[in-house]
Amino acid sequence: MRTALTELVGCRYPIVQTGMGYVAGARLAAATSEAGGLGIIAAATMSVREMTEAISGVRERTDAPFGVNIRSDADDAAERVEVMIREGVRVASFALAPRRELIDRLKGAGVVTIPSVGARRHAEKVAAWGVDAVIVQGGEGGGHTGPVATTLLLPQVVDAVDIPVIAAGGFFDGRGLVAALAYGACGIAMGTRFLLTSDSSVPDEVKKVYLAAADTLVTTRVDGVPHRVLRTPFVESLERSRLLRAVVNGARFKRLSGLTWAQMIREGRRMRHGRELTWAQVLQAANTPVLLRAAMVEGRADLGVMASGQVVGVLDDLPSCRELIERVMSEAETVMERLRAP
């Protein structure tokens, strides 16, 4: 299947694996790209050295194009951009709103720029900067998310910009791909569906929690930004807690990261992105990585936060990335044939 996305980045199928922190490493990104989709390394939760090693790890596994996701507000964002350019990364994506100078540098070096947005005005802004495409995530999506459903947000963005639009939030099968194409998108991006594959490095015990899950909630207790996560006793305790738990979690992250309290507070304040946050939320924003890492790396579902889209309630298997992508494309072809039938 050829779309504006496949033509732009050189992948075989219009399917993107999103850059999920502590989930999308070299193994998952390479498996996705090798299967014909576009795999994206989640470098926002990596050091520069780890990011460079992950890029090398993908290169060792596949010659297919792939992307790297970074936080453009990070102190070392410019350094990361130079690494991506030097290593010949095909696609740059952004966990949060990119800085224009980073976009200009990447585009000048021939890197395809694809930021993620959650509102039409944000899509219009980055399109005016000259980005190559946008991923637009509706409220069904996991992690940082907005209040508008994909079915309402997607057509708004498609109508508002003249660049390829990739749909995210609520997608998991071929029917969704066809629906996104009908709305005017050039492909779909999936996070939770790729998290629940055999190629994902998420611990098996955590995958079992996802497969058994039936509910998510949107909380601001993680970092002050609306965050869709699995509903767990730990998350419900975060919803009830205030400064004390933030300080306790912050102390743990301080030990792991080596940051001083002053550095943690500066990090938390930077992650506010102009919002008014309580001190508890500032500290939570600074130690968000430890909450994600606890579950996604250490396997502590009881002490961590597990970002998840609403699709988690309908997922019940762990296919390989190749099996997943081939299934989605087969389903899409079947649906399109049915629609073409008299």
Show where each model-derived region lies.
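Gly/Ser-rich catalytic serine loop of serine hydrolases
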Residues: 21, 168-174
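Short, structured patches in soluble enzyme cores that scaffold and shape functional sites
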Residues: 96, 138, 169, 192-194
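Conserved active-site-proximal phosphate/metal-binding subdomains
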Residues: 150-162, 172-342
